[in-house]
Amino acid sequence: MTVEKTKTNPNNTIAFQGELGANSHMACMEARPNFEVLPCHSFEDMLAAVQEKRAIAAMVPVENSVAGRVADIHHLLPDSGLFIVDEHFQRVNAMLLGIKGAKVEQLTEIHSHVHALGQSRKLLREISARAVQHPD
């Protein structure tokens, strides 16, 4: 299911997997600042948005320099009929957020995206918090 936040012009729209504010959204805004964005629920929905001409392109994460390959894309892209036509490198800075007054040493669980957890594995080991995966 694709989530459309606003009416978009498909010829000036770039689709991405995730919510507004996700790393892929930031990459879209940096790489194509004059494009409208189309947030999609899944990688399949993102690719379908281009196949169905609801977007002219998709910002597709293929690799994370710390956490490695984005495996789902490497399985989906070959059968999509789509091709890589450009490349963008997105710098990502992770931050640990908590409620006011929370102390790092009291944390028992950290909820985040699988790749963000992978990038933070040293911190997670240091504070002995359990990693809980979320889509975004």
Model-derived features: positions:
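Domain-level signature for soluble enzymes in the chorismate/prephenate branch of the shikimate pathway
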Residues: 1-136
